[in-house]
Structures are given as structure tokens and as C-alpha cells.
């Protein structure tokens, strides 16, 4: 199974700069992580007003972004081993926004997981409760636009001296899993 693929997008630098500006200037609670969460769903239409080239960036793949999350980490415990409860497909596309150099998304097989719902954001994921049969199978540094399998067990490690670590995780009108197969 292929767990990730780095891809090229148009207007990459514009999307990164617009995202960082949006988070700093319009979502300081998220940028500064004053809310006790790492996964912040954003209003897609509002986000696109501040990041007007987002849809153009993915036009070559014939996909339209309809789900935007800012993922903000301060420590390695912020993204312990988990499986996303993403019901709209197997993959999303992640973009590095800030301080991602040297961080890794590590994929596993095995393990036993239990649903967890963040009491603040109401977002659910499956957290590891037993390492039975757990085996590392792959890893990637999110240093460019990357398709990742979010519904497979994974965790993120970061350089805690470079905080916050921010990525954007995007969903689309059709699952970009087809990009893993190209």
C-alpha cells in the first residue's frame, strides 16, 4: 500500500503565504494555539476569500477543495498515534505552512484503537489503546504538497524547538486517492 505521494501544485507559494497571513491576522487563537486542540476546521468559503488561488492550485488534478483544517502542534504529544475518522475518503492533501522542517508523519499497521472526541472541537479520531501487532511501515516529511492516507494509523513527530508546527490538511469534492495510484 502506498501511504503518501508528494505532488506539485500551481500557486504553491501564494497558498502558503495567504494561509499564514490568514491564520496570523484572522485566526490568532488558532495560530497561537490558545484553544486546547490541534485540529481546527475552518470555514471553507471564508478561507477561500483570503486564499483566492486555492482552487486554481489544484485545477490540474480536476479537484475542488471543500474541507480545510489548520493542524497546529506545539509538542510531540499533540499528534500521538491515531487514525483520523475521515468519512469522505481515504486521503487528504497536506501542505506545510510553518516549522515543518525535520518533522515526520510516520505510518503504521496493527494496533488497537478507540474513538476519542475532543470536548472542545467535537472532532473525533481513533487513538491507540494497545500496541498489539504495531509495526512502522513508512514515513514522510511534509516539506511540499503531499497526499496522505489519513485513515491509516499514523503519528507526527516534530522539532519542539520550532513551534508551532502548522500544516493545512485539505479535503476535496472527490477523494484524491487516485493521485497515489498515478
Label the predicted regions:
Residues 1-64, 68-69, 78:
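Non-heme Fe(II)/2-oxoglutarate
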Residues 117-182:
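Catalytic core of Fe(II)/2-oxoglutarate
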Residues 67-69, 73-145:
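Catalytic core of non-heme Fe(II) oxygenases with the double-stranded beta-helix
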Residues 15, 80, 103-105, 177-180:
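Short acidic, gly/pro-rich beta-turn/loop elements at beta-sheet edges
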Residues 2-6, 90-92, 167:
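Intrinsic-disorder/low-complexity, polar/charged segments enriched in Ser/Thr/Lys/Arg/Asp/Glu/Gln
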Residues 7-10, 84, 97, 156:
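Compositionally biased, intrinsically disordered low-complexity segments enriched
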Residues 64, 89, 162-164:
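A short, structural micro-pattern
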Residues 11-13, 74, 97-99, 172-174:
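Non-catalytic surface loops within mature trypsin-like serine protease
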Amino acid at each position: 500500500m502506498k501511504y503518501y505521494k508528494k505532488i506539485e501544485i500551481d500557486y504553491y507559494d501564494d497558498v502558503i503565504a495567504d494561509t499564514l497571513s490568514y491564520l496570523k491576522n484572522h485566526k490568532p487563537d488558532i495560530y497561537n494555539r490558545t484553544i486546547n486542540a490541534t485540529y481546527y476546521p475552518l470555514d471553507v468559503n471564508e478561507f477561500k476569500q483570503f486564499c483566492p488561488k486555492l482552487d486554481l492550485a489544484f485545477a490540474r488534478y480536476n479537484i475542488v477543495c471543500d474541507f480545510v483544517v489548520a493542524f497546529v502542534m506545539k509538542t510531540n504529544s499533540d499528534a500521538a498515534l491515531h487514525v483520523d475518522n475521515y468519512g469522505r475518503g481515504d486521503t487528504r492533501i497536506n501542505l506545510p505552512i510553518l516549522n515543518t522542517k525535520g518533522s515526520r508523519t510516520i505510518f503504521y499497521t496493527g494496533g488497537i484503537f478507540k474513538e476519542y472526541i475532543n470536548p472542545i472541537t467535537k472532532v473525533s479520531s481513533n487513538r491507540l489503546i494497545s500496541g498489539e501487532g504495531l509495526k512502522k511501515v513508512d514515513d514522510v516529511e511534509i516539506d511540499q504538497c503531499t497526499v496522505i492516507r489519513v485513515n491509516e494509523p499514523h503519528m507526527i513527530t516534530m522539532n519542539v524547538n520550532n513551534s508551532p508546527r502548522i500544516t493545512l490538511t485539505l479535503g476535496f469534492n472527490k477523494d484524491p486517492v487516485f493521485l497515489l495510484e498515478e
